From Swiss-Prot:
A Pfam match: Melibiase_2_C
EC number of the protein: 3.2.1.49
Sugar-modified residues: N177, N201, N330, N385
Subcellular location: Lysosome
Active site residues per record: D156 (nucleophile), D217 (proton donor)
Main subcellular localisation: other
Presence of keyword Signal: yes
Gene label: Naga
Keyword Signal: yes
Protein name, as recorded: Alpha-N-acetylgalactosaminidase
Signal peptide region: 1-17
InterPro entries with a match to the protein in the record: Aldolase_TIM (IPR013785), Glyco_hydro_27 (IPR002241), Glyco_hydro_27/36_CS (IPR000111), Glyco_hydro_b (IPR013780), Glycoside_hydrolase_SF (IPR017853), Melibiase/NAGA_C (IPR035373)
GO CC annotation: cytoplasm; lysosome; membrane
Record organism: Rattus norvegicus
Binding site for substrate: D78, D79, K154, S188, R213, D217
Length: 415
């Protein structure tokens, strides 16, 4: 009953959300921050510094290596691109690292079928100390980004007060809309207010932003992934209703392809972010990423689930004494995704369960697929016991859909 109530609230809440027609499914793309941070030493490290070259090379990889065609279309600049403001107050990029300007990068991205995102901060300075967007500069900066043909703005919240943020984020949303250019708006607003009511009014946030950071920045470690997941689970009854087409909770970037996650942990982050209907922003070096990590990030069924048009955020539905957790996301056409997640740190665990225990209704027969192995699930009745073998800190993920009129069933006992 609780799950049905939350689903109803989610559908009602969507009527109150920002409707600029953008991001009807969670955005996908590449974002510089986690992997490249604020590396501005282009003399010592020209290949990896925050520069025009870096973003053009990542754009090439997105276009040529299959990413764009799967939906990874955003190429997002983060902090440390700004050179200052000119005599009229307009933002200018660093002239040495971005010699051709941001409009040039936008044109380059667009020529490859990509979209360009940019970063600023609702405060006197960005988090790394570059000129921010103060309240008196909101309209000017919005007009500048539109003139540069930018497609997304991430607006951080360092060096600002709660009062400035409460005024500034809605003001920027209005200013972006006034430009006439479709610019998706990514906000850090809730994260700076603690992420929860009463300090955060999610109805107002969702009426202002297309996506928003709720919690701490992700770091390149499994501990960081778990801390974010735990926070989302603890507050899922608050967070789930406000997420949906055009307005998404953002647990932060994907770490896959970097240094802090094992293979199973990488699969787990991808599966869990997918079931949370999270934006999928990679932040890795696409020039050197391994085939193994490409397979995780380019898994077509995972992407299909993430991009489901209903846009319902999944939730934790079952927690066992054996430290196995089950997450479910409801999808279009009565389909669903299940993630069996192991919190164990010892050895692969045989988890025994049935769909009935997971509150699937009697009277249906289900078919589907193991998302990572491709194994087919056929003729599964809710009453049927099954076993999944889950690696430590790993996942098994299923895509299921009901098949009507099927009176007999067969199924592999272990998937």
């Amino acid at each position: 009953m609780l799950q049905k109530t939350v689903l109803l609230l989610a559908l009602v809440a969507q009527v109150l959300m920002l409707e600029n027609g953008l991001l009807r499914t969670p955005p996908m793309g590449w974002l510089a921050w986690e992997r490249f941070r604020c590396n501005i030493n282009c003399e010592e490290d020209p290949k990896n510094c925050i520069s025009e070259r870096l973003f053009m090379e990542m754009a090439d990889r997105l276009a040529q290596d299959g990413w764009r065609d799967l939906g990874y279309v955003y190429l997002n600049i983060d902090d440390c691109w700004i050179g200052g403001r000119d005599a009229t107050g307009r933002l200018i990029p660093d002239p040495k690292r971005f010699p051709h300007g941001i409009a040039f990068l936008a044109d380059y991205a667009h020529s490859l079928g990509l979209k360009l995102g940019i970063y600023e901060d609702m405060g006197k300075m960005t988090c790394m100390g570059y000129p921010g967007t103060t309240l008196d500069k909101v309209e000017l900066d919005a007009a500048t980004f539109a003139e540069w043909k930018v497609d997304m703005l991430k607006l951080d919240g360092c060096y600002s007060t709660p009062k400035e943020r409460a005024e500034g984020y809605p003001k920027m949303a209005a200013a972006l809309n006034a430009t006439g250019r479709p610019i998706a708006f990514s906000c850090s607003w809730p994260a700076y207010e603690g992420g929860l009511p009463p300090k955060v009014n999610y109805t107002e946030v969702a009426g202002t932003c297309n996506l928003w950071r709720n919690y701490k920045d992700i770091q390149d470690s499994w501990k960081s992934v778990l801390s974010i997941l735990d926070w989302f689970v603890k507050h899922q009854d608050i967070l789930q209703p406000v997420s949906g087409p055009g307005h998404w909770n953002d647990p932060d970037m994907l770490l896959i392809g970097n240094f802090g996650l094992s293979f199973d942990e990488s699969r787990a982050q991808m599966a869990l972010w997918t079931v949370l209907a999270a934006p999928l922003f990679m932040s890795t070096d696409l020039r050197t990423i391994s085939p193994q990590n490409i397979d995780i990030l380019q898994n077509p069924l995972l992407i299909k689930i993430n991009q489901d048009p209903l846009g319902i955020q999944g939730r934790l539905i079952f927690k066992s004494k054996s430290h196995i957790e089950v997450f479910k996301r409801n999808l279009s056409d009565d389909a669903s995704a299940l993630v069996f997640f192991s919190r164990r740190t010892d050895m692969p665990y045989h988890f025994h369960c049935s769909l009935l225990e997971l509150n699937y209704p009697k009277g249906s027969v289900y078919e589907g697929q193991n998302v990572f192995t491709g194994d087919i699930i056929s003729g599964l009745h809710p009453e049927t016991n099954f076993t999944v073998i889950i690696n430590p800190s790993g996942v098994v993920m299923w895509y299921l859909y009901p098949v009507k009129g099927l009176g007999i069933y067969t199924m592999m006992s272990q998937l």
